A protein has these predicted regions:
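Extended, histidine- and acidic-residue-enriched regions that form the cofactor-binding/catalytic faces
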Residues: 2-6, 18-174, 178-299
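Sec-dependent N-terminal signal peptides
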Residues: 5-13
Length: 299
């Protein structure tokens, strides 16, 4: 059987040589190689694909990364032509609070802001931001786990994300930042994009980062913090973070260890702190919505 197998291989090879050898006259019975599509054919196929209807029900989300490209296209066609680029950070926040504090707050804030606007989507949160120097380590970089990028890296990232959205057809690009160190880079990125585009379509909403306003609102609600415990942490921000995920401030572990306070205010019971956080989030989100609408209107 092995001899016959070898002979079969030789016969097939000879036939292939005769069929494919150069200069052989075309034979309707001979196999032909598939022709690669022309550039025109590839473009026609793309145009057919880009116009395809969504074959399934769309996801109810305002987060671009959670959507399919078809869902983004259809959302834009339905009027969602404002894109929000939220910036957070990965930085030390004391012994209880996760490094991604600002990112967790933004998960709740950007979602609510986009839905209240009714015409907006959120990009993925920009989590890598300037947090201090490398060598020597400065600022939050003195603490393990903090991640930093250079100012120019941060600004270029913001510009590239904003320009990506612009070329897709988003009419207004909104920058909001949950950390103070992000504000200058966002303002610079918005200014650079507006200069490139020749029109004011990128907007840095500095008023989102109104810590004094949030504290004043908290005081109106009957809560005042005492002297600082010396950590990069506050009760008002912890309460807003807990509306998204109490485990990110180690709620259960702190209660068990008798450490459930910050700056003289107890974060227990959980339900009361979350209720306050929801009111503070609502106040800041509503203010931000107004500021975004004013920026888009040119006021």
């Amino acid at each position: 059987m092995k001899a016959w197998s070898a002979i079969s291989v030789l016969i097939l090879a000879a036939v292939a040589f005769l069929v494919m050898r150069p200069g052989r006259a075309p034979d309707s019975q001979a196999p032909t190689a598939m022709q690669a599509p022309t550039p025109e054919e590839r473009e026609a196929a793309f145009q057919a694909e880009i116009r395809m209807e969504n074959p399934i029900a769309p996801l109810n989300s305002v987060w671009i990364e959670e959507l399919t490209w078809i869902e983004v296209r259809d959302a834009m066609a339905a009027g969602r032509t404002t894109a929000i680029i939220p910036t957070g950070g990965v930085e030390q926040n004391g012994p209880y609070v996760a490094l991604g504090k600002h990112n967790y707050v933004l998960e709740g804030a950007c979602d609510a802001i986009a839905r209240e606007l009714g015409n907006a989507l959120c990009t993925p949160i920009i989590k890598l931001v300037p947090e201090g120097g490398f060598e020597p380590k400065t600022g939050h970089m003195r603490y393990p786990g903090t991640l930093t990028v250079r100012d120019e890296t941060f600004q270029m990232m913001l510009e590239d994300v904003g320009h990506s959205l612009h070329v897709h057809g988003f009419e207004h690009i909104i920058y909001i930042g949950d950390s103070g160190g992000n504000q200058a880079g966002m303002a610079a990125a918005a200014a650079a994009l507006n200069e490139r585009w020749g029109e004011a379509k990128a907007h840095h909403i500095a008023g989102y980062y109104d810590n004094a306003g949030v504290v004043a609102r908290m005081n109106e609600l009957g809560v005042e913090e005492g002297p600082s415990d010396g950590y990069h942490d506050t009760y008002w921000l912890t309460s807003m973070q807990m509306t998204v995920d109490p485990s990110t401030v180690r709620y259960d572990e702190r209660v068990a260890a008798g450490k459930a306070t910050i700056n003289g205010v107890s974060i227990a019971p959980k339900e009361e702190t979350i209720a306050l956080g929801e009111q503070l989030m609502e106040w800041r989100n509503n203010k931000t919505v107004e500021l975004i609408r004013e920026a888009i209107a040119g006021r």
